[in-house]
């Protein structure tokens, strides 16, 4: 394995201003990296302390020339690809395929064109590639069976990356569901947390029977950093907690944290026919490659989210 030496520390992160990117920036800086990264052109720059020391470059992943120039300027030792059309329920599949496949190819071409070879290129895929056909604990040997456009685009991205394995030390991460402070309420757990933090009496949800392997975003970025530094090129790794929680268990945790029970209504508009029914992962391969990693209990993550949101509400009251 090729390891990045402490004397040479610069990382280039796509999607740096996104939910995961901000935590990745903190993780990289704490490890001694100078952080460069992309943000969507025209988007307002966030006033976020996590990004205060970062070099932000407004670049569209579909603009191959601009991406090539940005990568050449950064000359990174490590590349972390987080930018994507990331929500399963996105209603523009053409854009999802463009960004997640063509955008990734543009990044790999840009990275391969840098005058010094990066020591690691981490691509964030998704455990959604496993689909909903295989019950139980999923490891990386399970045949992919994507059940929606987002998952198909991520699997196609993985296959596209194989074309660059002879030129770049590519590592693919398949994160299962994860959450934390700052994630959009378009996702399930932040939606639930927001309702409880606001003391709302009721909530409308979709499929109550789903089970998910939930991680804390801080644990996910810790795993990404370990993979960058170990650089096991050509391999694919689940990033997960190895524990699946039902929606009922999550609601019970939030009820204990918030101090009341919310009234739940199942709204057919939120029920997706192709919903992945159960996702639980094995991280045995990850453990062998990088050693033990932290696993934050889900109730601690939820409490962090509820307390933070309530604190923000009190500050603006």
Where are these regions (language model features)?
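N-terminal Rossmann NAD(P)H-binding glycine-rich loop of SDR-like oxidoreductase domains
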Residues: 11-31
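Conserved Rossmann-fold NAD(P)-dependent oxidoreductase catalytic core, especially the SDR/UDP-sugar
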Residues: 81, 105-149
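NAD(P)H-binding glycine-rich loop region in Rossmannoid oxidoreductase-like domains
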Residues: 61-99
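C-terminal substrate-binding subdomain of Rossmann-fold SDR/epimerase-dehydratase oxidoreductases
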Residues: 198-317
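N-terminal Rossmann-fold cofactor-binding loop
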Residues: 38-43, 61
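NAD(P)-dependent short-chain dehydrogenase/reductase
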Residues: 135-136, 159-213, 217-226, 251-257
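Rossmann-fold cofactor-recognition segment
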Residues: 50-63
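Active-site helix of classical SDR
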Residues: 153-156
């Amino acid at each position: 394995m090729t390891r990045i030496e402490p004397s040479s520390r610069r990382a280039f992160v796509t999607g740096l201003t996104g939910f995961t990117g901000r935590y990745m920036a903190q993780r990289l800086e704490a490890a001694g990296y100078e952080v460069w990264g992309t943000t969507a052109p025209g988007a307002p720059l966030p006033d976020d302390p996590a990004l205060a020391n970062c070099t932000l470059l407004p670049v569209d992943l579909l603009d191959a020339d601009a991406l090539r120039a940005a990568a050449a300027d950064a000359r990174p030792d490590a590349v972390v690809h987080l930018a994507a059309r990331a929500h399963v329920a996105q209603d523009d599949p053409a854009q999802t395929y463009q960004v997640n496949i063509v955008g990734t190819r543009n990044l790999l071409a840009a990275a391969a064109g840098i005058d010094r070879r990066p020591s690691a290129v981490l691509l964030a895929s998704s455990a959604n590639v496993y689909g909903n056909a295989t019950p139980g604990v999923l490891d990386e040997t399970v045949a992919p069976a994507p059940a929606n456009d987002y998952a198909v685009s991520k699997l196609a991205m993985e296959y596209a990356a194989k074309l660059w394995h002879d030129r770049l030390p590519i590592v693919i991460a398949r994160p299962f569901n994860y959450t934390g402070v700052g994630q959009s309420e378009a996702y399930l757990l932040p939606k639930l947390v927001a309702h409880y933090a606001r003391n709302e009496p009721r909530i409308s949800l979709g499929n109550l029977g789903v089970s998910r392997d939930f991680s804390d975003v801080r644990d996910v970025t810790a795993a990404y950093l370990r993979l960058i530094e170990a650089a096991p090129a050509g391999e694919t790794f689940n990033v997960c907690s190895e524990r699946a929680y039902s929606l009922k268990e999550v609601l019970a945790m939030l009820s204990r944290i918030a101090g009341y029970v919310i009234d739940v209504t199942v709204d057919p508009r939120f029920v997706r026919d192709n919903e992945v029914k159960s996702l639980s992962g094995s991280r045995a391969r990850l453990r062998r490659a990088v050693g033990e990693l932290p696993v934050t209990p889900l109730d601690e993550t939820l409490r962090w989210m509820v307390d933070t949101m309530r604190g923000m509400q009190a500050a603006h009251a």
